[in-house]
């Protein structure tokens, strides 16, 4: 099999992959859109004691650190809005990325509270405690490393519930502590819960999946338990069946491209993970701790951690085991993860993600050089066998079975592997697709600039210069490669392959196209080096292609 047929095969594989991606989107329709109610959603059925309703009317307080801007409703103490100050909404925008949101068209909130027999949160009748706050605005000052936001609620029996949010500098992990002082004459039985509530349907401004040629990243719920390191639990799963598992430690999360929210209960405690369809187009995933009894005059603290931010793998791994697995590298994660670690290591020296991609391309192609050399050697031997194969076809005629048997006998006698030219292709395709997943899922590469006009390696080239350059390099590889293709139709297909690939690559991330350009340039250099060696062995001639 010669190199041009390899190009045709890689094109077919890539087209098949893109068609499969588009089919995944088209055959997983979103549920029918419903009007979102911000304040009156209550779980029904068996989960009514777990999933909590909306926040209702309360006072909104603002919290700002160096990386987060939050809006907290004093009714329930839920986080109704969260902006990530280090991440612009779009490239070049002065607006920051809004992860949590509460609007008439879309709801995404982080909720927590105390349920149970004596808890101030009562999902059954829609009650949420109305907290008091010392001020309505909290800002992490210069030189300050920690910011605490206390919310206080006093029950009718005099018991005091203080809900404190603890935020730290340069940190997306938020501590949520409940300090309970039982001033009543009877024991208090309480259960700590935390849940993430989100609209199932995306409004247009949040919908980034309109381009069917783009990788469709996962959006939905996920969890980690003592039995499962990482498990996706989609909105469709929530609609079909409520999650209900008991585990020690672990976490529950809502995921989307580049960003995540997650509740992490205490690692040494047993919790119940649950999900619920709340109606009005809302779904939730959360945890509920074991009941805690506080005797009269006794004080206790219950705590959990909330992650609201980008999927920075090393930081997430420090917060909870396996939380870094929320970065959605798809079915090629086992290649994408080490590839990203290598890319990040290179970036620590180079300081530019584009140059890091160039370096990693040289490393990958260098490792694959022995296979590439074997590929070209195999193709050269196959070309030398063409006269014998042609004579064999003329002698045998239409007897396909006999032709196949004699061809295999000839390959064996000449020590030629007819599939030898395919191995580098088979290895390169997973690496290529893994890099695609990595570019589209690693937040470090979001809006990462290269040089000149390339301001975002995770987005397509705005001027299509890189795809055109890629097409030119493919053209030169094609011109320099000997061919045994004699069929006119195949020859026409091969002629248009650079054009076809250029069109495909117009919509691909600039970082991916950059990888392919550099890979093609390395191919040209390796090709010349290998051909010189083959000439000395009499396996290659530098005659011009006709």
From Swiss-Prot:
Residues 30-44 have a biased composition (Low complexity). GO terms for cellular component: plasma membrane. Keywords: Cell inner membrane, Cell membrane, Chaperone, Membrane, Protein transport, Transmembrane, Transmembrane helix, Transport. Residues 30-55 are annotated as: Disordered. The chain crosses the membrane at residues 6-26, 344-364, 419-439, 457-477, 498-518. GO terms for biological process: protein insertion into membrane; protein transport. Gene3D superfamilies: 2.70.98.90. GO terms for molecular function: membrane insertase activity. InterPro entries: Membr_insert_YidC, Membr_insert_YidC_N, YidC/ALB3/OXA1/COX18, YidC/Oxa/ALB_C, YidC_ALB_C, YidC_periplasmic_sf. The keyword Methyltransferase does not apply. It is a multi-pass membrane protein. It comes from the Bacteria. It is found in: Cell inner membrane. Interacts with the Sec translocase complex via SecD. Specifically interacts with transmembrane segments of nascent integral membrane proteins during membrane integration. Required for the insertion and/or proper folding and/or complex formation of integral membrane proteins into the membrane. Involved in integration of membrane proteins that insert both dependently and independently of the Sec translocase complex, as well as at least some lipoproteins. Aids folding of multispanning membrane proteins. NCBIfam families: PRK01318.1-1 (NF002351), PRK01318.1-3 (NF002352), yidC_nterm (TIGR03593), yidC_oxa1_cterm (TIGR03592). Belongs to the OXA1/ALB3/YidC family. Type 1 subfamily. This is Membrane protein insertase YidC. It comes from Yersinia pestis.
């Amino acid at each position: 099999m010669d190199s041009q047929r390899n190009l045709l095969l890689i094109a077919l594989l890539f087209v098949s992959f893109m068609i499969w991606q588009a089919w995944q989107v088209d055959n997983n329709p979103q549920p029918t859109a419903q009007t979102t109610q911000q304040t009156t959603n209550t779980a029904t059925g068996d989960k009514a004691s777990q999933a909590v309703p909306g926040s209702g009317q309360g006072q909104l307080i603002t919290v700002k650190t160096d990386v987060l801007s939050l809006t907290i409703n004093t009714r329930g103490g839920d986080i109704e809005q969260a902006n990530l100050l280090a991440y612009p909404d779009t490239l070049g925008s002065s607006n920051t990325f809004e992860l949590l949101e509460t609007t008439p068209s879309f709801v995404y909130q982080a909720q927590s509270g105390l349920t149970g027999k004596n808890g101030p949160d009562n999902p059954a009748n829609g009650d949420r405690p109305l907290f008091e706050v010392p001020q309505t605005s909290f800002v992490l000052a210069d030189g300050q490393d920690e910011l605490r936001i206390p919310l206080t609620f006093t029950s009718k029996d005099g018991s005091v519930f203080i809900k404190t949010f603890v935020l730290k500098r340069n940190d997306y992990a938020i501590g949520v502590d409940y300090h309970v002082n039982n001033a009543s004459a009877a024991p208090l039985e309480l259960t700590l819960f935390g849940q993430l509530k989100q609209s199932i349907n995306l409004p247009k401004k949040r919908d980034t999946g309109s381009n069917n040629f783009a990788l469709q990243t996962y959006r939905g719920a996920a969890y980690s338990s003592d039995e499962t390191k990482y498990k996706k639990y989609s909105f469709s799963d929530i609609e079909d069946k409520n999650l209900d598992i008991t585990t020690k430690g672990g976490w529950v999360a809502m995921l989307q491209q580049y960003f995540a929210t997650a509740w992490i209960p205490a690692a040494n405690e047993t919790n119940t993970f649950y999900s619920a369809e709340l109606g009005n187009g809302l779904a939730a995933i959360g945890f509920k701790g074991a009941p805690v009894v506080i005797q009269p005059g006794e004080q206790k603290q219950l705590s959990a951690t909330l992650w609201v931010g980008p999927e920075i793998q090393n930081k997430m791994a420090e917060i909870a085991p396996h939380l870094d697995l929320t970065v959605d590298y798809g079915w090629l994660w086992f290649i994408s993860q080490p590839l990203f670690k290598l890319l990040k290591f290179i970036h620590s020296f180079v300081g530019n993600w584009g140059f890091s991609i160039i370096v990693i391309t040289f490393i990958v192609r260098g490792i694959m050089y022995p296979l590439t050399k074997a590929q070209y050697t195999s193709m050269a031997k196959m070309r030398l066998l063409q006269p014998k194969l042609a004579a064999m076809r003329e002698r045998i005629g239409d007897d396909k079975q006999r032709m196949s048997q004699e061809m295999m006998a000839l390959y064996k006698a000449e020590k030629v592997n007819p599939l030898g030219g395919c191995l580098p292709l088979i290895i390169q395709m997973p690496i290529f697709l893994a890099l695609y997943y990595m570019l589209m899922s690693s937040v470090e590469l979001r809006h990462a600039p290269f040089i000149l006009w390339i301001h975002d390696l995770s987005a397509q080239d705005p001027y299509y210069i890189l795809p055109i350059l890629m097409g030119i390099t493919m053209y030169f590889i094609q011109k320099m490669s000997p061919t045994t293709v004699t069929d006119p139709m195949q020859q026409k297909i091969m002629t248009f392959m650079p054009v076809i690939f250029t069109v495909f690559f117009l919509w691909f991330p600039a970082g991916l196209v950059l990888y392919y350009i550099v890979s093609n340039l390395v191919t040209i250099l390796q090709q010349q080096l290998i051909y010189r060696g083959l000439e000395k062995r009499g396996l290659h001639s530098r005659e011009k292609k006709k």
